[in-house]
Swiss-Prot record:
Gene Ontology BP, a term: negative regulation of imaginal disc growth
Motif mapping: SH3-binding: 1008-1020, 1149-1157
Region (Disordered): 176-212, 520-566, 611-656, 688-732, 766-792, 815-880, 939-963, 1000-1022, 1190-1267, 1345-1398
GO-annotated cellular components: apicolateral plasma membrane; cytoplasmic side of apical plasma membrane; cytoskeleton; Kibra-Ex-Mer complex; plasma membrane; subapical part of cell
Name of the gene this protein is made from: ex
Compositional bias ranges of the Polar residues kind: 192-211, 524-544, 848-859, 1253-1262, 1345-1370
Modification comment: Phosphorylated by Ack at several tyrosines including Tyr-227, Tyr-423, Tyr-679, Tyr-766 and Tyr-1103.
SUPFAM superfamilies: PH domain-like (SSF50729), Second domain of FERM (SSF47031), Ubiquitin-like (SSF54236)
Protein name: Protein expanded
Pro residues bias spans: 818-838, 1001-1019, 1214-1230, 1237-1246
Pfam (any one): FERM_C
Lineage of the organism: Eukaryota, Metazoa, Ecdysozoa, Arthropoda, Hexapoda
Length: 1427
């Protein structure tokens, strides 16, 4: 990084005197956007200045003018007529001519102009003009689109009327209101005379009456629609007599229209359009211009570059490489004229797997397909790859802003829909954001997988298209029935009238009154319109996609065309038929109806830049693959855009791979709804076979292809599907073509408020539950007897069935009030049908009770501050190759736990609003975000919580993956193929707090554990001990049914508030004890069989050091039935049955836990016979009850253990004695006076379970390392370093004072060396406690100096072992007990003495402070004096 900026602030002129400039200074020109006389800024730069410095100064300049979106723009260089964006880190001299680098005139040419010019251009195109924050940014964006329209080659029959309309808007934005003197008398009277040539070249005059100008916007647009449509195909129009000469125009036509449209007709039409926008503000005109220009053609709101299709091709190339906000388009081969439209290939960002270039070759890979293009130079390929990478990253960054814009537009659109038709139209024309109500039809190709774009095309089906359809054959187009919709989906562009008809048809929106007004259009335009409709639609069908591929304003949330209907409907259509021949269609004059094989009209218009595309090739992707975080920079003549940290790109190659991402969590939080997104696509979901078969061609190839519709905030009730079926009708009876037409064009009845229903099977926002008794639901045949407990954890969702006998005392749950009351009074409730569906989403087909698998849901616990509740995982398909659908909902922050929306800490009281689900969710920070549980939170409880009507269902586990640290998959209760017959083998699973991507395979359990018993025989007995009354029990069941439904709000049943929460807890615990007393022990269950039954079991903690690094805070509170014991060591399974492990009398008790430091001394004083019951300590009230197993030292951290086997150390060690070597002789009887009174650090008396608990004798390190626990052989040195601190050990040693036992166990130094290899214990600890070992080391201690001296200078090599080093290191401590019968032991916080240097002390790290050594020597001398 440069120390200072070498670029000056912008200068107005570059005429500074030469003597004031340094020799290395150069002038640089920056051309700004503009048409007439673009402004130029000048910078004084250094020869070694970089592009980034100039960009920084430019941003500062525009920031002073109020620009907030400076990052939208970049600095480009003009290379071969194309604007290529310069690399910010490159030097300016790289893009300047050689004369600029070596210039002696400070980079100026002979005319005083800088030789190096940069251009200020839009680098990142956006989807909605409402994303622009300020007027300066909007003005520059408007100027860029004006430049693009003049430079792009657009199909003339599509563009000429649209360009005239845009020119009128540009005149209004640039010049304001039209001057009054420009119109002649005939214009004022409302007539214009024009002639058009007929087939023989003869000119025939035709007069079109133009209505008088009215201030009402809808009349203005109708007048323009009629006028421009009547003159749409007149190529040569003679000059009217009253038309002033060309020089009299108040504008330059070349600044507003391409050269091909410089005709008198275009001039007069421009003036008429300009007058129509009288009174419109400049900002509104620019905003409308941006909106309409984005919908015109795919090349306007994008970058276009010429590329070669073949290596041998000459020139700049015949293909267009288009980079826009959502991906890449390739317009291949032909010139873009009306006769031969180029073939279009679209690659959306989620579908692109890799972008790379190798010198002049540029390659795009999408799934199994690839496209190879060739550039004119290596540098162009490098800059193109950099642009694609930056655009992809920018689109992800901008997704949050697009989400906000979409919400704002939806709200304002809903408001404008309630206005009068004419008033709404005028508001939509004059207000910037009242523009969101058009039927958007997205053609989504799910059969193309990743090979092509996820969205093949988008088009707008609105009444401006119907304007032409009404008077134009074929007749089926006049009414969008289900058959005509299939054809309409194949039209890739907003075709029909928005391109062919004029001004008014482009901005006039679908209102019922205007249909009647447009029906009187002159018939001479009908034939022309028909031909245009067919031609343009078929051409764009062959292209495969459109400009509005959800990037344009027509179908994006910011669409000006969205005014007239109640909701934006996305129609997902799978197009598998071959495209229609364009020539044949044009000649026939009528489009050929081609039916799609699968489609579904889905409601909702939440469009974001980063919506997830479901890919069939990655079935385990839970979240979107579109959000990514690229870290590579491409340099040189080739590169690969990739996320993997591969080899750095060189000057000749580069790659950008777009597979995985670290921002997938962010993408899921940003994207509101996949179904209505630009990239979204869904896998078809299986239906139950009990549904009526559907044979219509619009809704799909099979009856299973119904999909959940979008979570729209507007169309909440009485909505419809694309096939015309009523969502509240389980049989999916289709609507008629007339009814569907009424709904599409806005004549249908949509409630503009939240709806309330009395049925749990509707798609309303509120459900009102009855207070009276209802008929009992049918249940399956009763299974085996109930388990000995009846409890459900409020966080994990683990629920057990009720006990056989109810507690006499009725317990009721106090129902919290709903946060939001329903908007309308409740409707009288309808009786619940006997077999209710298992799960209800917004609008899925109901699942009947059969042997089909029930869906397994995923709960996404989002880590953001305000995430949308995830509606993850609706209905899993039966076929293995099908992908579980992923849903990202637009629903507001209202979940099934609306009554309890706060985060629940570990010690919080139970939440009675939590669903009775056998699932567990823990967020990454350890707290359970229970208010973020999905509404489809797992209906997999085989224990049948309150109101589940079906018990025997198989479970299909869905693939899931972490999104950052956000999502944790829910493991269902049973995952066996025959769950209905194996209820006794079910196992409860408690998911812990796990960091992302730490799912480890659980170790096999070595102890048999009792499975949870089977479900109860009947549903009504579930809450019989809690709710005595039938009404209360029924309310609870109805409430639980709401939790599985698709509603936004849940009205909690009113229970008897006489019983408090504490009494409820007491009753629950009492039911546990009562169930234990009366339940017979279940049959023994083999642990490995349990692992086979439930394979998807996750460890509570990762394997190695994580349990030793932090306290284990499980996602549970101190409920005995919902926690489990986690013991160290491989001998025990980390997963116990939560109830059996701690409650069942037949269960074998777990090994005793290590003692707390406070209880250690008392246990030592009690003797070796102390029972294990005295070792349990009470846990804290807010902690897990099993945290009394204090696995971590509370005091100071222990010093590191010695290296494991010394022979494996990298450091050189003295040779160890062979195993056959005879150890030195051991004294037959130790001398009492020379014995240290300190017993071993952990004598056998401190381990009450010495015989049956070998794990506690093995060090934690040995256990985690996977070594086999070895018997202690009477050494009593098995310190568990993970359980007690040094302070606790020394305190226990001082209390014990067991001299006789220490004397009775004389240790062998060779055996101690052998044992010290596998013990987590320094040898110095044993030497400090047993003086008899010191003799065997042949070390003599000088009592005066406290230093050791070897007995002989010629020691054998076997004697110089680690024991010698450790014993000599501890000599400073041992020398204190030379003469005294008692010794002052080392302070617990003191470090161990250092090892001598000649013994390679770097292999261990025990040190001691010199001050401590001096203090010990003084104490030694005092002991000598006193003795």
């Amino acid at each position: 990084m440069r120390a200072f900026c070498t670029v000056s602030a912008p200068l107005e002129v570059c005429a500074s005197s030469a003597e004031q400039l340094s020799p290395g200074s150069r002038f640089l020109a920056l051309r700004l956007l503009g048409q007439q006389q673009p402004k130029t800024l000048y910078f004084l730069v250094d020869a070694k200045s970089r592009v980034r410095e100039v960009y920084t100064q430019t941003c500062l300049h525009f920031a002073t003018q109020g620009m907030l979106d400076t990052e939208l723009f970049g600095l480009a260089v003009l290379i071969d007529g194309e604007y290529m964006f310069a690399d910010p880190e490159s030097k300016l001299s790289k893009y300047g001519p050689k004369s600029w680098r070596s210039s002696h005139t400070h980079g100026l040419d002979a005319n005083g102009r800088p030789l190096l010019e940069l251009h200020f251009r839009v680098q990142f195109y956006i989807e909605s003009p409402f994303m622009l924050k300020d007027e300066t940014s909007r003005h520059n964006y408007y100027l860029q689109l004006r430049h693009n329209i003049l430079q792009r080659d657009l199909p003339r029959e599509q563009a000429e009327q649209a360009l005239v309309f845009l020119a009128g808007l540009a005149l209004q934005a640039d010049l304001g209101d039209a001057p009054p003197g420009t119109s002649n008398s005939k214009d004022d009277s409302g007539e214009e005379t024009s002639a058009s040539p007929s087939n023989g070249g003869r000119g025939l005059s035709a007069t079109t009456t133009l209505p008088k100008i009215s201030k009402r916007a809808n009349e203005r647009m109708l007048r323009l629609s009629t006028y421009v449509a009547s003159t749409s195909k007149r190529e040569t129009i003679p000059l009217p007599p009253s038309l002033p000469p060309n020089g009299a125009d108040y504008y330059r036509i070349e600044d507003y229209l391409p050269s091909g449209l410089h005709t008198p007709w275009a001039r007069s039409a421009m003036r008429a359009c300009h007058r129509e926008h009288l009174g419109m503000a400049t900002a509104e005109a620019e905003l409308l211009y941006i909106q309409q220009a984005c919908s015109l053609h795919e090349t306007i709101n994008a970058h276009t570059y010429r590329m070669r299709l073949a290596k041998s091709e000459q020139g700049s190339g015949s293909a267009w490489f288009v980079v826009y906000a959502k991906g890449i388009k390739i317009l291949g081969g032909e010139s873009t004229n009306s006769s031969s439209n180029p073939e279009t290939t679209t690659f959306l960002w989620p579908n692109i797997t890799k972008l790379s270039f190798e010198r002049k070759k540029f390659e795009i890979r999408s799934g199994e397909s690839r496209i190879t293009l060739y550039a004119a130079s290596d540098e162009k390929n490098k800059l193109l790859l950099t642009l694609c990478k930056d655009t992809h990253q920018w689109s992800m960054k901008l997704a949050a802003r697009l989400k906000e814009v979409s919400k704002r537009e939806e709200e304002e659109a809903a408001e404008s829909q309630r206005l009068h038709a004419s008033y709404a139209c005028s508001r939509s024309l004059l207000l910037p954001y009242k523009s969101k109500n058009e039927q958007r039809i997205s053609v989504i190709s799910s059969t193309s997988s990743n090979t092509t774009s996820g969205i093949v095309s988008d088009r707008v089906h609105s009444e401006d298209e119907l304007e032409i359809m009404i008077n134009t054959p074929p007749a089926p187009l006049a009414a969008p029935s289900t058959e005509s919709l299939a054809l309409a989906h194949l039209l890739d562009r907003p075709s029909v009238s928005r391109q062919t008809s004029s001004v008014g048809q482009m901005s006039l929106k679908d209102l019922e009154e205007q249909l009647a007004a447009l029906s009187v259009r002159p018939q001479d335009a009908s034939s022309n319109g028909a031909t245009i409709v067919t031609n343009s639609s078929v051409q764009r069908n062959s292209m495969g996609t459109t400009a509005n591929d959800s990037s344009t304003a027509t179908d994006s949330p910011s669409s000006q065309h969205n005014i007239g209907s109640q909701c934006s409907s996305t129609c997902s259509t799978v197009v598998v038929t071959s495209p229609v021949n364009g020539a044949g269609a044009s000649s026939s004059g009528a489009p050929i109806p081609v039916h799609s094989t699968s489609s579904s009209l889905e409601l909702g218009f939440s469009h974001t830049a980063q919506n997830s595309a479901l890919s069939e090739t990655s079935p385990d992707d839970f979240l979107s693959t579109s959000a990514r975080e690229e870290t590579e920079s491409v340099s040189g003549a080739s590169g690969v855009y990739t996320l993997a940290h591969g080899a750095p790109p060189t000057e000749t190659s580069g790659v950008y791979t777009m597979h995985s991402s670290e921002l997938t969590g962010q993408s899921s939080e940003i994207a509101e709804s996949e179904k209505s997104s630009h990239y979204g696509m869904f896998q078809p979901q299986k239906l139950e076979e009990t549904h009526v078969q559907h044979s219509d061609s619009v809704d799909g190839k099979k009856k299973e292809d119904f999909r959940p519709r979008s979570d729209s905030n507007v169309s909440t009730g009485s909505s419809f599907r694309g096939d015309g079926s009523d969502p509240t009708d389980n049989k999916h009876s289709l609507l008629s073509a007339e009814e569907l037409t009424n709904l599409i064009v806005g004549r249908g009845t949509y409630p503009s408020r939240k709806t309330v229903s009395s049925s749990l099977h509707s798609d309303c926002d509120y459900v009102t539950l009855p207070l009276g008794d209802q008929g009992e639901e049918e249940v399956d045949q009763p299974p085996a007897p109930p388990p000995p407990y009846s409890a459900r954890h409020e966080k994990t969702g683990l629920c057990g069935p009720p006990i056989a006998k109810p507690i006499p005392k009725p317990i009721a749950v106090v129902a919290p009030k709903p946060d939001s009351p329903p908007c309308s009074p409740p409707v009288p409730p309808a009786p619940i049908p006997a077999p209710p569906p298992a799960i209800r989403r917004r609008d899925p087909p109901p699942y009947s009770i059969s042997s089909k698998p029930r869906p397994t849901s995923l709960i996404s616990v989002s880590s953001s501050a305000h995430p949308a509740p995830s509606a993850a995982g609706s209905m899993s398909s039966l076929k293995s190759e099908e992908v579980t659908a992923r849903f990202i909902t637009t629903r507001p922050q209202i979940s099934i736990l609306k009554a309890h929306t706060s985060l629940i800490p570990d010690g919080a009281k139970p939440s009675y609003a939590a669903p009775h689900h056998c699932s567990s969710v823990a967020s990454s920070n350890g707290s359970v975000c229970s208010h973020q549980l999905s509404q489809q939170s797992l209906h997999n409880s085989n224990y049948a919580g309150g109101s589940q009507a079906s018990l025997h269902h198989h479970h299909v586990p869905s693939h899931h993956r972490h999104s950052g640290s956000a999502a944790i998959g829910i493991v269902p209760y049973g995952l066996h193929k025959s769950t209905a017959s194996l209820h006794h083998q079910q196992s409860c699973v408690l998911l812990p707090v796990i960091k992302p991507r730490q799912f480890l395979a659980p170790p096999p359990p070595s102890l048999p554990r009792q499975p949870p018993p089977p479900p109860p025989p009947n549903h009504p007995h579930l809450a019989s001990h809690l709710y005595e009354r039938e009404m209360a029990r029924k309310q609870l069941e109805l409430y639980q049914q709401q939790l599985y439904s698709d509603v936004d709000y849940v009205i909690y049943p009113i229970q008897d508030p006489a019983v408090s929460q504490q009494e409820y807890l007491d009753a629950k615990q009492g039911s546990l004890l009562a169930a234990m007393a009366q339940a017979a022990p279940p049959p023994p269950h083999h642990p490995y069989l349990a692992m086979q039954v439930s394979p998807a079991i996750y460890r509570s903690t990762p394997y190695l050091p994580l349990t030793l690094s932090t306290h284990s805070r499980y996602a549970s509170t101190q409920n005995l039935s919902d926690t489990y014991v986690q013991l160290p060591g491989p001998g025990y399974s980390p997963l116990y049955s939560p109830s059996m492990a701690s409650l069942c009398s037949s269960y074998e008790p777990p090994p005793p836990p290590p003692l707390h430091p406070a209880a250690l001394a008392a246990a030592a004083a009690a003797g070796a016979g102390s029972s294990s019951s005295s070792m349990f300590a009470r846990s804290r009230s807010d902690d897990n009850i099993l945290n009394s197993l204090d696995l971590l030292p509370k005091g100071k951290r222990l010093p590191p253990p010695p290296p494991p086997p010394y022979v494996n150390r990298r450091l050189k060690k003295p040779p160890m004695p062979a195993p056959s070597e005879k150890p030195p002789p051991i004294p037959s009887k130790p001398i009492p006076s020379r014995m240290s009174p300190i017993p071993p650090r952990k004598p056998p008396t401190l381990n009450p379970h010495h015989a049956n608990s070998p794990l506690t004798k093995t060090s934690s390190g040995a256990q985690w390392a996977g070594e086999r626990p070895r018997p202690d052989l009477g050494l009593g040195l098995g310190l568990n370093r993970g359980n007690n601190s040094i302070l606790a050990q020394l305190q226990a040693s001082m209390v014990a004072q067991s001299h006789a036992q220490a004397q009775a166990q004389a240790l062998d130094i060779a055996l101690l060396r052998e044992k010290s290899k596998h013990l987590d214990l320094p040898l110095i600890s044993a030497l400090c406690n047993d003086r008899s070992l010191l003799k065997q080391t042949k070390v003599v201690i000088n009592p005066k100096t406290g230093q050791e001296m070897p007995t002989s200078s010629a020691q054998p090599s076997g004697a110089t072992t680690n024991g010698v080093a450790n014993s000599s290191a501890g000599a400073g401590t041992l020398s204190k007990a030379r003469k005294g019968s008692t010794v002052s032991h080392r302070h617990p916080q003191d470090k161990l003495p250092p090892l001598p240097v000649q013994q390679l002390a770097e292999a261990n790290n025990y040190v001691i402070d010199p001050a401590v050594m001096m203090k010990q020597q003084q104490q030694q001398q005092q002991h000598n004096k006193t003795s």
